Amino acid sequence: MTSPKGKPSPKRSAPAPTTAALTPRTEERTEGATSSASASASSHISSSFDSPRDDTVVFTGYTAESKHNAHGYERLHDIILQDGDTGADSEDGRANEDNVILFPHAEELANAAAGINGDDDNGRVVRLGTIQHLEESDSSEDEPTLNRVGDIPLEWYKDEDHIGYDIEGKKLMKKERSALERLLEATDDPNAMRTIYDALHDEKKTLSNADLQLIFNLQRNRTTNPNYDMYSEVQEDTVVFDPLNHPLARSGGPSKRAFVPALHDMKVIAKMVRRLRKEEAERKLRPGKEEKEEEDQLLWDDGHVEMDTHTHFKYFNRVPKPKLPPPGTFESYRPPPEYLPSERAKQRQARLRAIDRKEHFLPQSFDALRHVPFYHHTIQDRYQRCLDLAFFPRAQRTRLVVDPDKLLPELPDPKDLRPYPEKLSFHYKGHTATVRSVSVSPNGQYLATGCDDHLVRVFEVQTGRLMKRYDMGAPVQQVEFCPSTSLNILAAAVEYSLVFIVPTFAAHTLVNDHTIRFLRAPGLSAGQREAAHALGAVDTLGGRAVTQTTLDADETAHEATADLHDIEEREKRAEFVDASAKERNAGIVVKIAMHAKVKKFCFHIKGDYLCALCPKDHVKYRQTIMLQLSKRKVFCPFRKFSEVVTDCRFHPREPIFFLATTNSVRCYNLMAHRLQRRFKASGGVTTCLSIHPEGDNFLVGDTTSHTSWFDMDFSDKPYKRMRSHRGVVNALAFHPKTNAYPLFATGASDGQVHVFHGMVYDDYNKNALVVPVKILKHQRPVYAVAWHPTLAWLFTSTEDGVVTAWTE
């Protein structure tokens, strides 16, 4: 059996039940009923599960000795009444039959409740309004709740060694049961199927037969007492059934046709249903119509005036007439002197025809408003006004109201796109003029800067230490490391020449020797290059340099392989010049002399080819010059090209060359020797160009503060055109490892560097995702930006000679 608090009780023998009854107040019956019969005809129903009648309330329970079967009802004090003659009525068999057992305990309890055994003397009746004193009992169920944790989730104690606290605050420890003990209990205990677990007290309790009977009745929506008859109160003479007078018994009953609707009735009902559904759908489409009908209506509202369609259209679709312009200063009766016409102007006005005159009068000055004469052109002006109103075009244009916030794309939070450069970490000092270019070595260990103070400086990235300075003798336009890790070359554009430097401290000796032979000995085979690695070298003050024996061998090899038939042609384009002894001591190996100032240049990904731009060369086809360093070849690929070039780049994976002009970007196929595509750069003059490492996208900056993202698979026009700066975009660059860091940066003359997250997907159904993530601010215009090859670090240079490193 389960107590009212959900606490299961162990199985035990059924206690002797007792009856607490409330004898109803009897009423005399007028139709031959005796007083004794009316007193015994009381009705008793369960107070917990059935509705009591107006004249009878009976509660049948158990005595205090067996209060463990009515644990929840012992604490109810003002519930039960007793009449004085209850004992007399208990002898009546009718009264005993009407008693109801709330919680039957098998057949024994039912018989005891009905008074069959004659144990009614053991019952105890309490009057309503008195306190029922509980008697002492040794039953375990009569004990109060041991666990005093209250109404809280018991899951809070699942990780503890106790289940709660008793009334004295002591812990109630858990009972540890092994898996074997639980298995034995489940197999050996005959009452395992009727045993439940009390989680509040950490113990098992067995359900009695009465508990199972109660659960069975509740599951089937029955009364708790199986012996209760809800129709015991009904008198036999109150309900009389005569089969012959029943409607179904007369004339054989109704036919089946009476219950089947007629066909025409079904059609009418279906039509009504369709009309109701249609009205419901229209009501959903116009949710505000019913609300307007419920509101108070204006008495003189034009919306309730009945009018035809034409009048309704003219009334509700009228276009307001255009207003007259306000009078100007020249129409004043006392205008300023500068508005008064001269005699020459009056004569010119008089010579014009009336149709050619802008105004029909000339400004005049009067001392007072009353001196102003009548305007002779009043009627003509009114007539012209009427013509304008009658013939001016009336047109209605639907204005589309769009929320600007809905037009913006949904972008992710920049915090979720980390890492990207956020804070200033390093200052590389020592520059005294504008730093126009920065470049990072392929291994990310060294940083080279080109400055207007004629010096090329190489710093160590991690420490900021100045490793080497190279005096170029003129302002340096650009510096760049060779992207190939097998070559240690630092190239610099200095006015009319390209200078190739070998910073010996930046690579191993074998790499340095291989680089020198790569630049000085064209035509050597791979075996000869490997054999050349074994030649000796000495250290000088200017760095590590090759011996004179090595130089002589290189010069002999160069003279033996020189193309004598192409000397004049080479002189027209560019010329390779070997460095002097002093320059070789400083690390300078080769110079390339140009006919005009070199503005920009770029390396191929393998380091053998190089393209230089000389936009101010008077010979148009020499503006773009390509060089092959290993063979010292010079050629101009664009013979009939006449546009001014601004920047150039090699495709990182394919033999494609990008050339940026003032208003377009040309894409050339170097294998087919033809123009492959042309991209239109809308806006101002292009200033810089950067190719995505995957090769399918590129960026273009211009003088109108715009950065254009081009997708080669999308269109010839920009996929995105971003205006984030307020000055000329001077530099932009993609991160070399976009798979790990999908970033690119733009620097402009407004002193800001904008960092973007630019994700390119392999799926052609997804467009590139461009999200601005950070703005890095400087005091002066930014001229160059460069990314670290393996980290999310950004290097910038400004007009005032500040070179900084921004890290994560």
Curated annotation (Swiss-Prot):
GO (cellular component) term, any one: preribosome, large subunit precursor
Sequence ranges of Low complexity compositional bias: 12-24, 33-50
Positions of region (Disordered): 1-56
Keywords: Nucleus, Repeat, Ribosome biogenesis, rRNA processing, WD repeat
Top-level lineage group: Eukaryota
InterPro entries, per database record: BOP1/Erb1 (IPR028598), BOP1_N_dom (IPR012953), WD40/YVTN_repeat-like_dom_sf (IPR015943), WD40_repeat_dom_sf (IPR036322), WD40_rpt (IPR001680)
Name of the protein this chain belongs to: Ribosome biogenesis protein BOP1 homolog
